[in-house]
Amino acid sequence: MDAPFVTLTISTDAGRFVARYSEKGLAELNFPSVGRASSFHGRRRGNESQISLASSASVKDSSRRLLQVPASIRNWHQATETALKSILAGHSPKKFPPLDWTGKTEFQKAVWRAMLKIPVGRMKSYGEMAHAICRPKAMRAVGGACGANPIPVLVPCHRVLAANRKIGGFSGGLNWKHELLAREGISL
């Protein structure tokens, strides 16, 4: 059986995000979902066990379950919450939790590391990202890596656009992409 994942929520002015942690760090961050914001609704990996703190749980129940969460994950969750709220406020985060990209390709990891270097309020094209990772003809593959990003917002795939500043796609939906860019002072 796989090591357990811990699923925790983060309440923001934009809704309740769902963060999923492994023993190595933040593995996924999911956008709020209408009517299901308090439960995990991302990609599942087999028969994993989970510790889940849903917002609908009572305070007493949540406090009891929080004690089951390893201290390292509680610290990572605090860093995730702080970074997420900073980005949503249009600021650069000072600290990130460790990111768990286990099972991802080296190409995807290279694209995501390059995305982490895009400052808040700035954008890059898929072509510019391909050049940044020394794969100038891999624009479409960069788009695929953006779509496969399991930690959107913190790994800012919303800052990557198609040529001529066209919005392109976004795993969280185009409304979220517009919203995130607007929060960073960018209007398209």
Give the ranges of each region predicted by the language model:
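Short Lys/Arg-enriched helix C-cap and helix-to-coil transition segments
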Residues: 153-160
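…primarily DNA-binding HTH/wHTH and HhH modules…
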Residues: 163-188
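Short amphipathic alpha-helical/adjacent loop interface patches that line ligand
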Residues: 77, 81, 150, 174
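Basic nucleic-acid-binding alpha-helical/helix-turn surface characteristic of O6-alkylguanine DNA
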Residues: 1-136, 187-188
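Regulatory, non-catalytic segments
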Residues: 140-149
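LysM (lysin motif) carbohydrate-binding repeats in extracellular/periplasmic proteins that recognize
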Residues: 136-139, 180
